[in-house]
Amino acid sequence: MKKFECLYEGTAKQGNPTLLNEIYTELYITESESGEISNEHEMRQIETQSRRAATEDTPIKCNDIFRPLPGQDKPIRTVLTKGVAGIGKTVSVQKFILDWAEEKENQDVQLIFPLPFREINLMKDKTLSLSDLLHVFFPETKEMEISNDKYKVLFIFDGLDECRLSLDFQSDVRLCDVSESASVDVLLMNLIVGNLLPSALIWITSRPAAADLVPSECVHRVTEVRGFNEPQKEEYFRKRISDQSLANIIITHLKSSRSLYIMCHIPVFCWISATVLEKMLSEAETGEIPKTLTQMYTHFLIIQTNIKHEKDYEKNMTDEDMILKLGKLAFQQLVKGNVIFYEEDLRECGIDVTEASVYSGLCTQIFREEFGWYQGKVFCFVHLSIHEHLAALYVHLSCTNNNINVFDLITKQSLLSIVTDWFQLNSSEHVSLSELHQRAVNEALQSKNGHLDLFLRFLLGLSVKSQQILLQRLMKQTSRSNSNEETVEYIKKKIKTIDSPEKSINLFHCLNELGDHSLVEEIQQYLKSGRIKEAKLSSSQWSAVVFVLLTPEKKLDKFDINDFVVRDNTTEQLNVLQKLLPVIKESRSVQLRDCGVTDEGFSALTSALRSNPEHLRELNLTGNKIGKSVNLLSDVLQNLHCKLEKLR
């Protein structure tokens, strides 16, 4: 039980442990419609969730995930819990086990076997039986017989997104005997499907991108951890910070920055913010209080690397060496899509595996080394956002210190090109920061799942003067101010040309990191004065409208097309409708009276509504000739998750 009673915020077996029951803040968990895959960067998903009211969802307590809701009578064997990185999935597992061990909850379960995928990965090449697998992880089970219904057993597989096994649910290999040997992936597949121990309960956690790796027919309930809701955010800071007046100041500061407060849905970000702001505000440190994500993460990095100077390691390793090696690891694994690493990954980046614990000690809260039940080492950064910040810092320092554009190093196809480019990179030709930024913008825009979105925001934010002052120990020279001016202009040009609302929204976040708010402020003036109807907006200005409407202090409630365009100008109304579809799908009331929606426009509208059917409550289509498109609307209304109350 000792393994689960303490919470090491942000770190494993290092730092200051806190009793879980003292700091635990109930997370907002709901039943989700499916385990379908999400191709959005998790930052976008957090922003989307922050805009949606929670009142219509039925919350589920962590300890109740295997209990049917009122009106549900089918037994629940397998639960899939999804949620973005750092949202609290693993802590929920820890709390579930602790409450069970303390005989508070779920006492009908006799045995719980927590099997994190990052530890199971270490045995991916082994052939053994399920009994043998349990004996390896839990030696005390050697005297137990779990092949029958004598025990009610729960298996917890935490971190499906970290799985490096080949889980083939189409395989014909069928195992029904716990003493029969097979590869570990076959064992797990048969256990999840129900061939092995069909009476056992199964709990799988995953980030959204991997949620569909387990077929839906094998899952009886899908839940989603949404992190902290508004009251829970404040509760966390009041528990975490003993000085309540300081806690109030920190909460007020975070609320003043929309981009920071949105991130507070993620418990790990609350911990990062508390670490930084408590130190800066309580110790009267000089310098600007962080208002952007980059500022917050850079301050956090500095606080944690300063631990180094309290230890004896500085004789062997400089800050720059340590940061560059970890940053290189972060960047390479980000490009590959990996969030956990093994010994071979460290070696590729010049990190001596025998010194890994030293790196872990130097960056206590940033990089962690874990020893699982099975003898082996697993490495990861505390949170994906820390991973992305270090990757961005590596790319930035490679350019400013070593005149290298690292994007040129990941696109080489032949040995000849590598050798040729090595000479080019080590020539006197200058690699400008604006060129690096433009390349990074293009790489991020080309990403299908937006996996470089936050990395890009960090990379651009690191070039701001205030950041260069903070990082002066690491930087050989500062960048020129006109580099950022060129980057700002390049981003504004890109906003005019891209069709994806999600990608344009991220570019506005990038402008925010660079300190440029001109487009947004211009649109805010139009909206406040009511002159937006008369204004002839450019495509980039309409993108700014979407950004402003989707990042308000209050959640969206009503969208009326006539607030944005003169009534009876149907051509312009249709044009505006197309541009504001991202806003429409986040609105509870959509008013499209007399706007001449054509079949083409209606097709786009129903597509937007279909992507978020449970949110819309009122739809007004009065005065539009719907025609054949009525079938599209019918499909939306028949969706099981549609909660439309009023249609006109």
Question: Residue locations for each model-derived region?
Answer:
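Intracellular innate-immune signaling modules
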Residues: 1-648
